[in-house]
Swiss-Prot record:
UniProt-annotated binding residues for ATP: I197, G198, A199, G200, N201, S202, G203, T204, V205, K220
Any Pfam family: Pkinase
Protein name per Swiss-Prot or TrEMBL: Serine/threonine-protein kinase STE7
Enzyme class label: transferase
Activity control, per UniProt: Phosphorylated at multiple sites in response to pheromone.
Domain Protein kinase: from-to ranges: 191-466
Molecular function GO labels: ATP binding; MAP kinase kinase activity; protein serine kinase activity; protein serine/threonine kinase activity; protein tyrosine kinase activity
Keywords linked to the UniProt accession: ATP-binding, Kinase, Nucleotide-binding, Pheromone response, Phosphoprotein, Serine/threonine-protein kinase, Transferase
Organism of this sequence: Saccharomyces cerevisiae (strain ATCC 204508 / S288c)
């Protein structure tokens, strides 16, 4: 059905996800069928068949389509003194951090009006946006043509006219769409859900197939509280930043988004899919193999060559964001660095990124675990804060443990961690293992508490650890490592699936024996 000539093949990279509500006086949905140049009109019975297999906009593979999927299967069998009290400086009339319970997103309170977006910290919501220093105005999100309001007709997405019945936030969202001239759009039935990638308090991420061009994408679904203009404004501002970032080898590509207001009240974002997942996922898979006894805990998956390539990809992506767009990521951690089997490193989730004003960002937001000392103390924050986070991430990758110890996500646990970051000595690679002088020096230069003494991104890009592995042969070795990781991830999924099947079978047998 997806292969009918009535479905036009489109390039997803040039996609604009535009939606239009078409509601009658009785509030019922009215179906519309878009006619395209060079295409015949979609027949009503085709649309009915599509509706029959659609369940909450999540479609699953049919047998005929499954044969078309050709994911690269590159399998490979190779294998302290008394601490001082932390003083958090909070400028007057500036946002201040409010730690809320785990069931809620931590926000930044302000004396400004409600229209000023609240900041959602990344440790409990990776999709939050940082506000600019001024209140939201149409100019801050001008030209955001890829965000739209929901489709009332489930089969097509097009630019809607403004409606008086919409909330102010939704109206502002539509204002950003005015002037969209690109006629490209996507049909919802073209997206086929393949499986879940991850889920959290802030939403879910699934792997999906765009059928017309056989493109695999990642689809994020972010629930939004009904008529919550604060959250919507945050997401609009964040997506406006991401949309304006042009494709780059070390930045995840943004394809489009739309706001589904009337059906599930959620924002859906489409972006580039990385088949090896995040560094955090790879680290979790490694730990499961260690627990099974099939991998030695003394032999890490992240050798020096791998660390060099990862560090270069992160630094190059950060440098691009800063030089071209004056953006600081501010949330560098394993879960926000993605890898694919082609050997590409990608930065994602600009959840607390902020466009710089006067080249300095001083708002207290971000993931507290990887937060630099100067941010905790309320000092001015620059791009060197991401360098600190990179150093902590490298230590975690090679050791398998966060260098500053564990903590809980309660306010007391977070405050204890912040005290340790400021008062304890700078993290270092463990002395009970052997690391090269290049690796040790690189980490030491990242994890310097005094920001002025900490190395810059430019300096680290020319560090011996990076330059040591710059060659085509080293690139080939890293791609080989990525393919092995992809194979290990598949193996881990198979083992977990088999264990689940055995558990279900044992449960059934136990229930039968009791009867």
């Amino acid at each position: 059905m997806f292969q009918r000539k009535t479905l036009q093949r489109r390039n997803l990279k040039g996609l604009n996800l535009n939606l239009h509500p078409d509601v009658g006086n009785n509030g019922q949905l009215q179906e519309k069928t878009e006619t395209h140049q060079g295409q015949s009109r979609i027949e009503g019975h085709v649309m009915s068949n599509i509706n029959a297999i659609q369940n909450n906009s999540n479609l699953f593979l049919r047998r005929g389509i499954k044969k078309k999927l050709t994911l690269d299967a590159f399998g490979d069998d190779q294998a302290i003194s008394k601490p001082n009290t932390v003083v958090i400086q909070q400028p007057q009339n500036e946002p201040v951090l409010v730690l809320s319970s785990l069931s809620q997103s931590p926000c930044v309170s302000s004396s400004s009006s409600l229209s000023t977006p609240c900041i959602i910290d990344a440790y409990s919501n990776n999709f939050g946006l940082s506000p600019s220093s001024t209140n939201s105005t149409p100019s801050t999100i001008q030209g955001l043509s890829n965000i739209a309001t929901p489709v009332e007709n489930e089969h097509s997405i097009s630019l809607p006219p403004l409606e008086e019945s919409l909330s102010p936030a939704a109206a502002d969202l539509k204002d950003t769409l005015s002037g969209t001239s690109n006629g490209n759009y996507i049909q919802l039935q073209d997206l086929v859900q393949l499986g879940k990638i991850g889920a959290g308090n802030s939403g879910t991420v699934v792997k999906a197939l765009h059928v017309p061009d056989s493109k695999i994408v990642a689809k994020k679904t972010i629930p939004v509280e009904q008529n919550n203009s604060t959250i919507i404004n945050q997401l609009v501002r964040e997506l406006s930043i991401v949309k304006n970032v042009k494709p780059h080898e070390n930045i995840i590509t943004f394809y489009g988004a739309y706001y589904n207001q009337h059906i599930n009240n959620e924002i859906i974002i489409l972006m580039e899919y990385s088949d090896c997942g995040s560094l955090d996922k790879i680290l979790s898979v490694y730990k499961r193999f260690v627990q099974r006894g099939t991998v030695s805990s003394k032999k890490t998956w992240f050798n020096e060559l791998t660390i060099s390539k990862i560090a270069y990809g992160v630094l190059n992506g950060l440098d691009h964001l800063y030089r071209q767009y004056k953006i600081i990521h501010r949330d560098i951690k394993p879960s926000n660095v993605l890898i694919n089997s082609k050997g590409q490193i990608k930065l994602c989730d600009f959840g607390v990124s902020k466009k710089l004003i006067n080249s300095i960002a001083d708002t207290f937001v971000g993931t507290s675990t990887y937060m630099s000392p100067e941010r905790i103390q309320g000092n001015v924050y620059s791009i060197k804060g991401d360098v600190w986070s990179l150093g902590l991430m490298i230590i975690e990758l090679v050791t398998g443990e966060f260098p500053l110890g564990g903590h809980n996500d309660t306010p007391d646990g977070i405050l204890d961690l912040l005290q340790r970051i400021v008062n304890e000595p700078s993290p270092r690679l463990p002395k009970d293992r052997i690391y090269s002088k290049e690796m040790t020096d690189f980490v030491n230069r990242c994890c310097i508490k005094n920001e002025r003494e900490r190395s810059s991104i430019h300096e680290l890009l020319h560090h011996d650890l990076i330059m040591k592995y710059v060659s085509p042969s080293k690139d080939d070795k890293f791609r080989h490592w990525c393919r092995k990781i992809k194979s290990k991830i598949k193996e881990d999924k198979r083992i977990k699936r088999e264990a689940l099947d055995r558990a279900k079978l044992e449960k059934k047998q136990s229930e039968r024996s009791t009867h």
